[in-house]
A protein has these predicted regions:
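N-terminal beta1-alpha1-beta2 module of alpha/beta enzyme domains
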Residues: 1-66, 149, 359
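Active-site mouth loops of central-metabolism enzymes
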Residues: 8-18, 67-76, 145-156, 212-215, ...
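An alpha-helical appendage that flanks or caps ligand/catalytic pockets
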Residues: 2, 110-142, 187-320
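Hydrophobic faces of well-ordered beta-strands that scaffold small-molecule active sites
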Residues: 9-15, 35-37, 62-66, 93-97, ...
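Acidic (Asp/Glu)-rich catalytic clusters
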Residues: 25-29, 51-62, 82-93, 165-166, ...
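Short, acidic/polar
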Residues: 16-27, 78-81, 154-163, 310-320
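Alpha-helix-loop-beta-strand connector modules within alpha/beta enzyme cores
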Residues: 46-68, 72, 120-127, 191-195, ...
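Glycine-rich, proline-tolerant flexible connector loops at the mouths of alpha/beta enzymes
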Residues: 34-58, 69, 101-103, 175-179, ...
Length: 359
């Protein structure tokens, strides 16, 4: 039987587009703990408007972005926005913020370095809490506040995870598709927490983005139109997250930066794939999908980036992540009807909890 001291398994939904008030209510009824909106100023709906409407439609789920970027608004503007969401939602808001890798690149700006990111993020949190802060050498203070807004960092790399452990109330991990990565995340967040006299399990929530899909075929997600393109992008992004290493350093850098172990044969094929990858054809093109096939990486990528197959197999796959210490999952909608996606996800987590309790 499951241990009485185990953390509960929770789930929430990630959507880049406004899905409607009935959808938000349906998420809450399904048992979801969180609704979060992606931010990309040139490609997604504005998250703050969607979140404000979801706040009106719901009473229990927590609400926030996954994740906003520093510099898009001034710290006082962002603090005012999420203080307002905190008021509208009755205290259910959180603020997820990252260094802005994609959001800032999309508008021709450079992502923030970690030190500048930390200064920005902590200034926003202090302002939300009603404190006077110094930002850019100038004092700032909001004239009103709805109370503290929990600060979550979007983090994947070791140093960012360590800073999250030191400072953040929560962490959103965008790439946590393997038990080794979960252990890697917990190690670095835990080290940061310990250095600050904090507790990994008591003071910090870690939420992992989980791409799970029930399909007729085992590991069937990679065969679905659109998801194959996503897997190709993620394969390239994995290499980029490792620091764009040369072939001879790829396996070592993935292990160091991500906690992911690959063998020499996969490293060789990954190096070939990334050398031929065309970022200009990353969307609405099968060019990079065909590259995955050419380098024999299609099945490898499908197993790595997706938890898919018949329900009992997906439960077993996600159960491996739970056994490694992951208990909070954010599920993005990748294809198909989003209301049906809510129902399938709720069914998956009901089965996952039952499996854990019976173990």
């Amino acid at each position: 039987m499951g241990s009485a001291g185990e953390s509960p398994i929770r789930f929430g939904f990630v959507t880049p587009y406004f899905q409607g008030l009935d959808w938000a209510r349906h998420c809450e009824v399904s048992g979801a703990d969180l609704i979060t909106c992606g931010e990309g100023p040139t490609v997604f709906d504005d998250p703050t408007l969607s979140l404000a409407l979801y706040a009106e439609a719901t009473t229990r789920v927590r609400l926030g972005p996954s994740v906003t970027a520093p510099g898009l608004p001034h710290p006082a503007v962002l603090a005012n926005t999420y203080s307002t969401l905190q008021k509208l939602s009755g205290g259910r808001a959180y603020l997820g913020i990252g260094t802005g890798d994609l959001s800032l690149i999309q508008i021709g700006e450079r992502p923030y370095r970690l030190d500048a990111f930390l200064e920005y993020a902590l200034a926003v949190r202090g302002l939300c809490a009603g404190e006077e802060v110094t930002y850019g050498g100038k004092p700032l203070k909001l004239e009103w506040t709805a109370g503290p807004v929990p600060l979550w960092f979007g983090a994947d790399a070791p140093r960012a995870l360590g800073l999250a452990g030191q400072h953040a109330d929560g962490v959103i991990v965008g790439q946590a598709f393997h038990p080794d990565i979960v252990e890697h995340v917990r190690q670095h967040v835990g080290a940061g927490a310990a250095a600050a006299g904090r507790s990994l399990d008591d003071d910090i929530e870690i939420w992992y983005v989980l791409r799970a899909l029930v399909t007729d075929e085992e590991h069937g997600a990679i065969r679905i139109d659109g998801l194959d393109e996503y897997a190709a992008r993620q394969t390239f992004f994995l290499w980029r997250m490792a620091g764009k290493p040369e072939r001879s350093e790829l396996a070592a850098e993935l292990a160091r930066r991500k906690g992911l172990t690959i063998d020499d044969d996969v490293a060789e094929r990954l190096s070939g794939f990334t050398a031929d990858y065309d970022e200009a054809l990353a969307f609405n093109s099968k060019h990079n999908v065909h590259l995955l096939e050419r380098y024999g990486l299609t099945d490898w990528a499908g197993r790595l980036f997706y938890k898919s197959g018949p329900l009992e197999q997906v439960v077993a796959q996600v159960g491996e992540l739970v056994a490694a210490g992951a208990t909070n999952f954010l599920v993005p909608f990748m294809v198909g009807d989003t209301t049906k996606g809510v129902d399938q996800t709720a069914e998956l987590f009901t089965a996952l909890r039952a499996s854990r309790a019976a173990a």
